[in-house]
Amino acid sequence: AKTLFPYTTLFRSDLAGKTMMVQSTTKPEEIFLAGTDPRIPQFGELLSAEDRSVQYAMLNCGYVDAIAAHEAAILQYMQDCNANFRILEEPLLVTGIGVAFALNDTRGLDEKLTETFAAMRADGTMKQIVGKYLPDPEKYLEVDALEP
């Protein structure tokens, strides 16, 4: 999540009572609406928008205190639009990205892709590619920390 709060270091607890915006039908919306994660403070208000670009406009204009979105997407927005936001020190959620294949696909693409990704990780290719687009690429390759 990004915010314009005037704190040097920003933690989840700093979001208590604040207005948060998420994109509709996303994992952040699901987590915040469920209200079952004790690590997430009670927000003053939770707003959802169908289009994620609305989140950035609302944050830029000060209509919301923070947004919750994938960190890579926020970093890309900041780079593309010369925006200056801060990211929470503690992630709200760590997720992997999946690739789906048809159940009846017999080409073995899932195994080939898994093998290729493992080789790219082992030889540093994946780190090099991610590093071209994002600072601190190791942070985005911490897939071993994910639950199976």
PLM regions: where:
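Short, small-residue-biased leader/transition segments that mark boundaries at the very start
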Residues: T3-L10
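Beta->alpha turn/N-cap motifs
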Residues: P6, Q23-T26, R52, A68-Y77, ...
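Ligand-binding cleft/hinge of the Venus flytrap
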Residues: R12, T26-A49, M78-N82
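Hydrophobic residues within well-ordered alpha-helices
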Residues: L15, M58-N60, V99, L113
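Periplasmic-binding protein-like
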Residues: P28-F32, L75, Q79-Y133, D136-P148
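A ligand-binding cleft/hinge motif common to bilobed small-molecule-binding domains
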Residues: I31-G35, M58-N60, V64-V94
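Short helix-initiation/N-cap motifs at beta->coil->alpha
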Residues: L46-A57, C61, T95
